[in-house]
Amino acid sequence: MSHILDKIDTVYPFPPKPIPLSEEEKSSYIASIKELLKQKDAVLIAHYYTDPEIQALAEETGGFVGDSLEMAKFGNRHPASTLIIAGVRFMGESAKILTPEKRILMPTLEAECSLDLGCPADKFSEFCDAHPDHTVVVYANTSAAVKARADWVVTSSIALEIVEHLDAEDKPIIWGPDRHLGSYIANKTGADMLLWQGECVVHDEFSADALRKMKSVYPDAAILVHPESPASVVELADAVGSTSQLIKAAKELPYQQMIVATDKGIFFKMQQLVPEKELIEAPTAGAGATCRSCAHCPWMAMNGLKAIEKALSEGGEEHEIFVDEALRVKSLIPLNRMLDFAEQLNMQVKGNA
């Protein structure tokens, strides 16, 4: 059973789209980045939702492409003293929380996440304080300050198991920040959950009506859906899961066509694993010209070659992630609680977005 707060419609200002580079400029920046990675003892770690050329460069230079938690864990294990995180800001913070001794750089610190923006730490803390009998469970797509206020940090791959565990102990739950994922988990578990009203601007735009129409055009296609999508979209899915889980589903499902309802950046890695299959972008609510995100996170798009080269060459406060040590230690507690729980279940914890 879920208790949903009144939804507040928030229109987030999107950053300007990066200026396209010529092929000559791209080649120049790539060569410079490769040299700087060696000079700075750095490794490039990119999220699935960054542009394909960024993911390709990360792999080519011995870096990594993955979801949010995988990125932080790779950086923790890698011997490089500097991590350049191509993603959104909470991902850089997560890397710093797990690996405080390393220098964490980002192409820009202005790459936000609507889930993070929609869950300010002060407001969320007030809400939690008003319900002191509730266990606070937050999605990894949050700031270090919100994580520090939580009892548990979860990823979408283990959220169901943790909520089932808490529900078995008759613990009411505050869930934040994604209302769609919270509703999905509440419906699956029957747990008593109060849901914070955040959403991902990309997944919130997927349309069930438009998806049904697309399915009629591709009747033999499987539908893959991220659980940050509206319930009406999730109900149409053949597979529901995090980025890593959707990539796995694309490989395992016996379909030659896949309609994919998540950020289209995922197509780079997905197509690598299933080159023989046709991947089709799921339709957004805007049906073309009127969509806002159009199935690609506007903040992920800020992680361009020029910005990466600048971060490596200049560094400084415009690019380096710092997390207050007291806050870092406090936020590490609920994160380790999840990792310990996963170890007990012998589960491999994957990230979200």
UniProtKB/Swiss-Prot annotation:
Catalytic activity: iminosuccinate + dihydroxyacetone phosphate = quinolinate + phosphate + 2 H2O + H(+)
Pathway assignment: Cofactor biosynthesis; NAD(+) biosynthesis; quinolinate from iminoaspartate: step 1/1
Any Pfam family: NadA
Localization per record: Cytoplasm
Biological-process GO terms, alphabetical: 'de novo' NAD biosynthetic process from L-aspartate
Single GO MF annotation: quinolinate synthetase A activity
Needed cofactors: [4Fe-4S] cluster
Keywords recorded for this protein, A-Z: 4Fe-4S, Cytoplasm, Iron, Iron-sulfur, Metal-binding, Pyridine nucleotide biosynthesis, Transferase
Binding residue positions for iminosuccinate: 47, 68, 139-141, 156, 226-228, 243
Entry annotated with the keyword NADP: no
Residues annotated as binding [4Fe-4S] cluster: 113, 200, 297
Keyword Ribonucleoprotein in annotation: no
Superkingdom of origin organism: Bacteria
Gene Ontology, cellular component aspect: cytosol
Predominant localisation class: cytoplasm
EC number per UniProt: 2.5.1.72
Cofactor note: Binds 1 [4Fe-4S] cluster per subunit.
PANTHER family: QUINOLINATE SYNTHASE, CHLOROPLASTIC, QUINOLINATE SYNTHETASE A
Family under the similarity heading: Belongs to the quinolinate synthase family. Type 1 subfamily.
Functional summary from the UniProt entry: Catalyzes the condensation of iminoaspartate with dihydroxyacetone phosphate to form quinolinate.
Protein name: Quinolinate synthase
Organism: Vibrio parahaemolyticus serotype O3:K6 (strain RIMD 2210633)
Name of the encoding gene: nadA
